[in-house]
Amino acid sequence: MRTSLVVCLFWLLFQLHTTHGYNTLVNLAGNWEFSSSNKTVNGTGTVPGDIYSDLYASGIIDNPLFGENHLNLKWIAEDDWTYSRKFRLIDLDDTVGAFLEIESVDTIATVYVNGQKVLHSRNQFLPYHVNVTDIIALGENDITIKFKSSVKYAEKRADEYKKIFGHSLPPDCNPDIYHGECHQNFIRKAQYSFAWDWGPSFPTVGIPSTITINIYRGQYFHDFNWKTRFAHGKWKVAFEFDTFHYGARTIEYSVQIPELGIKESDYYRLSATKSLQTRSKNIMSLSIPMEHEPERWWPNGMGEQKLYDVVVSMGGQVKEKKIGFKTVELVQDLIDPKKPEKGRNFYFKINDEPVFLKGTNWIPVSMFRSDRENIAKTEFLLDSVAEVGMNAIRVWGGGFYESNHFYYYASKKGILVWQDLMFACALYPTTEEFIQNAEEEVSYNVDRISQHTSVIVFSGNNENEAAIRGHWWKASNYTESQQVKDYVLLYQRLAKIAKKVAPTIPFIMSSPSNGVETEEEGGVSKNPYDVRYGDIHYYNEFVNLWRDDTYLTPRCASEYGVQSYPMKETMLNWINESDWEYTSKAMFHRQHHPGGIATNLLMIFQHLPIPAECGSKSVSDVPSCKYISSASYMSRLAYFSQVHQSIALKTQTLHYRRFRNTTTNEGLGNTMCAMYWQLNDVWAAPTWSTIDFEQNWKMAHYEARRFFSNVAVYSFADETDFNLKVFLLNDNPYLLHNITVNVQMLSWGNGLDPILTNEFHIDSVPAGSSEVLKTGITFSKITELSEYLYVSTLYDSSGVKIHEDVLVPDFLFEVDFNTFGDVQISDVQRIDEKTYDLTITTDRVSPFTWITCKKPFTGWFSDNGFHMIQRLRKIRLIAKFEVDLEKSDFTVCNLKNCYV
């Protein structure tokens, strides 16, 4: 907004005073003293931090994540804890205000400064700004924070609720196999901290964030935010400035976007206020002239991720951030207006271009929010997402609203963020106290998060609507209609807040849900899993996950997956070697998935050979085979589990991708979203992750590079007509011209030479499409599939290989593993301190070729878990940090001999 000289003079005449002043920030991070409720446990801790980390650092407990310490340390969460420290103030001259500013308090705590109570916190997801002007003093001061046990607080509130309303609020407790705590739905704290089916229970207390005393003379420029909107051919940017001040004054704000040649300023009158806790929110709206049209920000794989520097100054105080320009639209029109029963679309447009969401689900990177390694872990994980061609990630609703750095880094990497509100797998209180607390939480976090370019949608919760309709819990004296009523009350109020704060970001009530259809049904659908609407979550461990026809055909699959085990190299950092057995006590207690001990075996040995040591046992009898549970077989079993996971995720993901722009006669299809569960881990255990706790890529993450490739070829055996079907997938926003598809059929006993080759030439493959190719390759009966390997390779007009797909037999146990190649590492070349090239050779087909490195490194191979169908391949190791390696540090194996 340009301000004329006349307007400026008008403001100058009437201002009381303009203060530039200077401010002092007193950082309260560092050493604090902590003690238990009865003072018998005490020591020196660190802020930012938490009680588990401090007890471990003080030598009072062992590493909480090792062995069975998650069971042995439950006494910590059942106690109250006190943290305190002293701090010195050396200059209070001309001070007009002082604030205690805490980014996050975990969770139920009372804060005292110089003996005076200044704050009672009740929400981990909120910052606190407390006026301490009249409490602090020159010289020595003290601050004390008394934390209540989160476990006991939640239990107390649940008991109070039941007495008042005559029913409990499900679920009362987590399943026993979680080894967790109860009633997390009564505390506004990360829900996973009470345990989940992929993680332990560590209900932390502490200050996991920055804590400061801000002393200012005049005004304090706390932060700024913005919203972008594209309308009538112009970009509009609304900036909001967050200022603390005392007394009436006039402030000059300046906004610069140097690369766009923009420099705007204005004066704002800040009215007098008696309370420094009242912020002054001031809004400046800018319309960017067309001669400075910004470059659009695009998701990974669709264009550049252009971000502009924004510099805002106020009274000599300067803050800088990054801003990107994109539009987002959630399309939910009817599939067929003449037949509305066919349902609605559900897909996103970025900058008016439809985008297929290819991604995964994000859980917190640690059980301990303040872990010093969390930033590096976050960046590595998001790098790993972008590296394999993903463009989207869903921040799951049982963890945290992530840090600003997370959303910035996602924007930098081109990762679209689907953001849940932090409500998951539970029903929640609808008392006015609880709802107002939740509204404040949602208002703050949606406002904070929505400024980041990567964010494309907010979802009200994870699976809560589905839980009601699926009758997940027994709830005495609490009918389904009452549950629906309470659910709608809470989430309609939260939706109203989110839509007001971030009007340009779509909002959906839940995930899974039926999108706009859910709203038309009053907020809760009769069937939230209806594939004709919205998104679905799909899990089924009693079907064949390697078959394309197993899967549903939804509009969007925002969760799906299957477990695998980390390799021995990861697990032995966190359990004793004597516990490296499938059903050892330590391993059993790390398997939190109900039924997972049995179903993992049933799924794996549906495809892979049962060890000879089990005799003639059938697949259903495998869990009773003692050899399966022995230390001798565990490493082999972990490898098999990763083989199974990689093919299951590949098959399901490519099933969804092949239905892009394609519908059945019933209207199913137009699938535009495939986001598997889950990316990462919070501990070393059997989970659904594709990157383990030590940041090692599992086989499935390497497979993701293939199944998420922008241009891909996908083959499967269609058993309805005994034909090999090949699909061409093009997620690029442009046509592919003069494409060649080569389909080879290899026999296991015929070395590397194909017994059949067909080649197909395609003039063009449209942008954003899935095209089927009739190969003419048939088989007379299902058992023939085990005799061959099918390789489909896509080449561009210059003959350069774009993508390769290998269809392995469904029943690999029918194949003679002795026919597999003898794979070797023939050479290792050091390119630089972070890069090594490996030469891999084989004499015959080498399925699921797996390279390992003895020395741990943070990074990845250019490929792994691949099927080697040529005599030689070059594989590159890319490390994030310097690592000294030689040939003897590497090993390679395949399905024949890995971990035998």
From Swiss-Prot:
Main location: other
High-level lineage: Eukaryota, Metazoa, Ecdysozoa, Nematoda, Chromadorea
Coiled coil, from the record: none
Record's subcellular location: Lysosome
GO molecular function: beta-mannosidase activity
UniProt keyword annotations, A-Z: Glycoprotein, Glycosidase, Hydrolase, Lysosome, Signal
Family: Belongs to the glycosyl hydrolase 2 family.
Annotated glycosylation sites: N38, N42, N131, N477, N576, N661, N738
Protein name per the record: Probable beta-mannosidase
